[in-house]
Amino acid sequence: MLSSKGPVRLIDHRDLDFVHRGGPPGKAAVARALSNEISPNLGIGFARWEGAEVAWTVLYDEVIFVIEGCFELKANHEHYRVEPGQMLWIPEGTELVYGGYALFGYVVYPGDWKRQHGLE
């Protein structure tokens, strides 16, 4: 039986359009995998970090799971190094700096956080 939200989807990072997110120095890019129309509850996608450092206060709960390389995050006076097979959970409101050299996937809740915070 098909879900009312549509079919199951297989998503390959190589098929997505990555958008600049940070750098220079370095480079950072993200690619949202599903639109808010398909999934307003969960935002999912991939990111590539190549030495850029991006400061941000997250407006959502976030999970980051590393596929290749080493992702780094500075938050709460801690420095986290996340390698393939590991993941981070980051609660809403965390002030942080993303960094490192990695390909990683992410999940955010709510997926439509920009709309909820008046940023769209």
What are these model-predicted stretches?
Residues 1-46:
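A short, N-terminal "cap"/entry segment at the start of jelly-roll beta-barrel domains
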Residues 37-58, 91, 108:
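Conserved short histidine dyad/triad with adjacent acidic residue
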Residues 40, 50, 74-78, 101:
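Short strand-coil-strand connectors
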Residues 48-49, 57-75:
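Short, conserved beta-strand element in jelly-roll/cupin
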Residues 63, 70-72, 79, 95, ...:
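Structural motif
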Residues 76-93:
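Short acidic-glycine-tyrosine-enriched beta hairpin
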Residues 92-117:
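Ligand-binding loop in jelly-roll beta-barrel domains
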